[in-house]
Amino acid sequence: KDKKVPVPIKVKDKPVPIIDINDDALLDQDITLAIKAFEDFGKAILIIWNKLDLLPKNSDPLKIIKEKTAKYKHFFDIVPQILFSARTKRNKEKLIPEIKALWARYSQRIDSKEVYLYIKELLSQKSLFKIQQKLQIQSLHVIKTSPPTFVIRSRQYALFGSSEVNFLTNHLRKQFDFKGVPIIWKINND
């Protein structure tokens, strides 16, 4: 008999992780791979929680997922998730529409001027300061989709740290429906 040899999965090739809701041993590994694909390789992510049929009868799958993924809350708040059972086909009808919706969000075209005006308005309401300097943006351009990539030109480009970028990312994600989509920023001098 031929033995099946596991084929290593390249992180960048796994944009739709299927995670066994009952397998705690692989849970951290699967989530780590999903986060790496999202953050390091710019892959859109949809999490599919499989094997719902194996949960105890009166259990709450959402509560179980929330407990098991508490330390990854920041990630699970921004990616779509589907509860699924391959055996019973529960929620099978939701898979293709959700994958298509994710692809539409990932590849959507956004006008640079629209994004710039949105960010400018946002910063007029909530200014960003670093080392007692008000951070200002001279220009913003969308340079690509899949994943959406933005270039900001600012005289204080060196002061833009992770908290400032996260602030912009979180607001942009909500405004333009980038759920499950990584957002790439390039910040340069004026």
What are these regions (language model features)?
Residues 1-14, 22-24, 28, 32-190:
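C-terminal-of-GTPase-core extension/linker across diverse P-loop GTPases
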